[in-house]
Structures are given as structure tokens and as C-alpha cells.
């Protein structure tokens, strides 16, 4: 992606087909290895807890489609990984630069303000992946190495969102 990211975005490029095929192949392997989503398959949820909360907060409006919400969720989860010392700054910058290249909405402050923080957090708490009073998140140790058995208390996410939405 770092080498061919901008070329992949050109929908006429033969690289788009290769990128889609590779993505689908990876997803297929993960799903086949964990059909019931009891372990490794959870890595496919990276960014989605934030993304689904963003969509729900906006009432599933046309302001933000699912793909755009996932992009924002990926960026938010990467930032949360960085701030919790799980992901290093070099890896975070690679992710951030790649997502910024996509020329899609990538700043949560264009959609949300500090007034939305409680609502976003409320939807995160209702996420189907949670099985305790804590919020389950898939975060990144490094690119291609997600960690899926992480639980965070509401306060930690509240403080993070408050900081991110106050820019």
C-alpha cells in the first residue's frame, strides 16, 4: 500500500483488482480459520467499534457512509493504540499517511464535537463485541499485527474521546 497506494486509488489501474483480490484472500483465510468468531477473526473488527458508534451517533445519515465511518474508526483506533503505547509513532504515521492519501473524510471533528462524546461512548458500550462492563477494542501492535483481547474501562475511552473531540 505504501508503494502503490495512490495507483490503487485510480480505479482504472490493474492494481485495484490485485488489491481487492489480496484483501478478500486475507479475509477468507481469517474467516475460515475462525468461522464462529471465537478468536482470531475478531481482528477484522479493527476500527469498527468506533466506526459503528460514529454511524449510530449520526443516525445512520448520509453525512457519513459506512466506508467513511470505518476509515474514521481505523484512524481513531490507530491513534488510541498509539496513545496507549501499543503502537509506535513510526507505524502510526504510516497508517495516518496512507489513510490521508485516500482523500476521504478523515477528521472526526468535521462530524462531531465534544457535545457528541457521551453519545459516541454510549454506542460503544452497546457494541455486540462487549461481554463485560468494559469496552472491547481491536488495536494494533504494528501494521498487520492486531491485538483483539483488549478491554478498556469507560473512563479511559471517555478521556480519549474528550481530547480528540476538543481540537
List PLM regions with ranges.
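Carboxylate- and glycine-rich phosphate/diphosphate-binding segment that chelates Mg2+/Mn2+
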Residues: 1-44
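C-terminal charged capping/lid subdomain of soluble metabolic enzymes
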Residues: 86-167
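Catalytic Zn2+-binding segment of zinc metalloproteases
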Residues: 53-62
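Short glycine/serine- and small hydrophobic-enriched flexible loop segments
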Residues: 56, 75-83
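Alpha-helical transmembrane segments of multipass membrane proteins
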Residues: 26-30, 53, 80
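Flexible, glycine/charged-enriched surface loops at secondary-structure junctions
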Residues: 15, 35-43, 64-67, 87-92, ...
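Small-residue-rich helix-loop
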Residues: 67-76
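Active-site His/Glu-centered metal-binding helix of metallohydrolases
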Residues: 46, 50-54
Amino acid at each position: 500500500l505504501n508503494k502503490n497506494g495512490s495507483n490503487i486509488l485510480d480505479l482504472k489501474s490493474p492494481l485495484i483488482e490485485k488489491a481487492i483480490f489480496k484483501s478478500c484472500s486475507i479475509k477468507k483465510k481469517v474467516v475460515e480459520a475462525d468461522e464462529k468468531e471465537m478468536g482470531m477473526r475478531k481482528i477484522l473488527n479493527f476500527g469498527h467499534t468506533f466506526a459503528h458508534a460514529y454511524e449510530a451517533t449520526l443516525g445512520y445519515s448520509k453525512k457519513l457512509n459506512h466506508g467513511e465511518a470505518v476509515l474514521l474508526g481505523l484512524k481513531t483506533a490507530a491513534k488510541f493504540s498509539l496513545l496507549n503505547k501499543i503502537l509506535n509513532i513510526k507505524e502510526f504515521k504510516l497508517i495516518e499517511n496512507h489513510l490521508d492519501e485516500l482523500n476521504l473524510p478523515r477528521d472526526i471533528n468535521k462530524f462531531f464535537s465534544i457535545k457528541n462524546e457521551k453519545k459516541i461512548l454510549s454506542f460503544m458500550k452497546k457494541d455486540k463485541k462487549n461481554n463485560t462492563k468494559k469496552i472491547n477494542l481491536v488495536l494494533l501492535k504494528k501494521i498487520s499485527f492486531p491485538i483483539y483481547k483488549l478491554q478498556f474501562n469507560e473512563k479511559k475511552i471517555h478521556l480519549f474521546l474528550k481530547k480528540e473531540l476538543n481540537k
